[in-house]
Structure formats: structure tokens, C-alpha cells
Amino acid sequence: MSSCSRVALVTGANRGIGLAIARELCRQFSGDVVLTARDVARGQAAVQQLQAEGLSPRFHQLDIDDLQSIRALRDFLRKEYGGLNVLVNNAAVAFKSDDPMPFDIKAEMTLKTNFFATRNMCNELLPIMKPHGRVVNISSLQCLRAFENCSEDLQERFHSETLTEGDLVDLMKKFVEDTKNEVHEREGWPNSPYGVSKLGVTVLSRILARRLDEKRKADRILVNACCPGPVKTDMDGKDSIRTVEEGAETPVYLALLPPDATEPQGQLVHDKVVQNW
């Protein structure tokens, strides 16, 4: 087991906002920071970049679309650290609006990574989360636009305090199926797979927070979703108005909430402010 028992993990951390979050955690978090990437060479290059800046991250390969890869990471964290203190679920995919890929394929691939794989990360790693742990799920303000463009019936379901994880999974599966059957608009869905995927992540964060409050309240584990804002990354494009360092501020703020904090919990946070939606 590592001589340092505290550990923070950032997924999709070889570039962009994930790398910026890992960099800032290396500076501020009291413990080891493990950055992950699907591509080993790119992940190790990111580690070398941070080492050149005088920081000391660790690297572990992770493909969040692969459940066995997630479980290998879980076993590593359990063996090396006895668990996990901070989880930042940043890894995601986004298609450009002019991408010629069929809409239903975009929907399936986007939901697979952004929602279902993120859910797998939470379900595999929350059981080893230590007391006062912090889970930060990177969402997007596009989730709010997606919500506004949902039918009233779907809005009520997403807002419901009794919505279960299983119910949410069924809704996300239905969106994918409705796109395949070319009926998603008629069924009340918006035309944004990315927005729907991040809406799912935001609602999942609320459901997981509620479950933790019911089953592990004394551990004070906080789960929140956040929007970094329009950041200059490969995903958001060069014309976005924020640097990756600015985009990392709210995720890092949530990751480093003090041990006695009880809120925010299960919220969507933008610019360190809870969003009402």
C-alpha cells in the first residue's frame, strides 16, 4: 500500500479540462493524484508534462467504456490506498454538429460513454469511497437546454424526487431506442444526444447523493455535477471564452470541499453557484 493513503482520481485527464483539473489537484490536494487516460502513451505524456512543472501525478490506464478496465482500476485503488477520496468523472465524448455520422449512432455512442460508463464508474467506485469523499461529475449547461426542450412529461419525470436509478437508466435507453426508430422528437426528446447524456449525469448525481444520504449519511460523502462553462478544448472549440484553468475552478472547488461540508449535495453547480432548474 502507498505511503500516502489519500488519493484523488481524474478520468480523461491526458488533455483539456481533465488535465487542468489534475494539475490543480496536484497543487492543492493533500495526497496522491492519479490521472487516467484510455491511451497509455498520451496518459504518460501528460504525466511527464506535469512532472516538468514540478508536480508528481501518477498514471493508470482506464477505458471507461470497458467494465473490466474500471474494475482493474478499482482493485488498484483498493490495494494501493484502501479506497478513494476524490473521484472526478471527466471522460466524455462529443460529436461536432456537422459530423456526418447518423443521428442514432451519435446518440448511442454519446450515451454509452457519457452516461452509462459514468454510471459504471460511480457504481464500481462509490463502494470504496472513504468517509468525507467527494464525487464530481462533469456535466454541461447544455443539459439545461436539453431539459427545457424536453416534453412536460419528461421534465416531470427528470424532476421527480422519487425517480430511481433504474428509472433513469430506462429513460436513457428509451432515448437511444427512440432515435433508432426515428421517433425521438415525437416522444418529447430534444435533438441533442450530448445534452441528454449530460442531463442523465446531472440527474444521476442527485439520485446517488440521495442514496448516500440514506445509507451512509455519517460518512458525509458529497456527489455533485458541475458545468465548467465554454472552455477552449478540443470538445468546445477554439472560440470558447474560458481557458481550461478557468474551467477547472468549479470542479476543483467541489473536489476540495472541506470535510465538515454537508452541501452542495446532489446539485448542478456552475461558477461555484448551485443552479436551480
Curated annotation (Swiss-Prot):
Belongs to the short-chain dehydrogenases/reductases (SDR) family. GO terms for molecular function: 3-beta-hydroxysteroid 3-dehydrogenase (NADP+) activity; carbonyl reductase (NADPH) activity; NADPH binding; NADPH dehydrogenase (quinone) activity. InterPro entries: CBR1-like, NAD(P)-bd_dom_sf, Sc_DH/Rdtase_CS, SDR_fam. Detected in ovary, pancreas, intestine, colon, kidney, brain, thymus, lung, heart, liver, spleen, leukocyte, prostate and testis. PANTHER family: CARBONYL REDUCTASE 1-RELATED, CARBONYL REDUCTASE [NADPH] 3. One of its GO terms (biological process) is xenobiotic metabolic process. Transmembrane segments: none annotated. The lineage of its organism: Eukaryota, Metazoa, Chordata, Craniata, Vertebrata. One of its GO terms (cellular component) is cytosol. Changing D236A: Significant decreased of the Km value for isatin. The modification Phosphoserine is found at S30. NADP(+) binds at residues 10-34, 38-42, 63-64, 90, 194-198, 239. Substrate binds at S140. The modification N-acetylserine is found at S2. Keywords: Acetylation, Cytoplasm, NADP, Oxidoreductase, Phosphoprotein. Optimum pH is 5.5-7. Catalyzes the NADPH-dependent reduction of carbonyl compounds to their corresponding alcohols. Has low NADPH-dependent oxidoreductase activity. Acts on several orthoquinones, acts as well on non-quinone compounds, such as isatin or on the anticancer drug oracin. Best substrates for CBR3 is 1,2- naphthoquinone, hence could play a role in protection against cytotoxicity of exogenous quinones. Exerts activity toward ortho-quinones but not paraquinones. No endogenous substrate for CBR3 except isatin has been identified. Its EC number is 1.1.1.184, 1.6.5.10. Pfam families: adh_short. The active site is at Y194 (proton acceptor). Its main location: cytoplasm. It catalyses: a secondary alcohol + NADP(+) = a ketone + NADPH + H(+); a quinone + NADPH + H(+) = a quinol + NADP(+). It is found in: Cytoplasm. This is Carbonyl reductase [NADPH] 3. It comes from Homo sapiens (Human). The keyword Protein transport does not apply. It is an enzyme of class 1 (oxidoreductase).
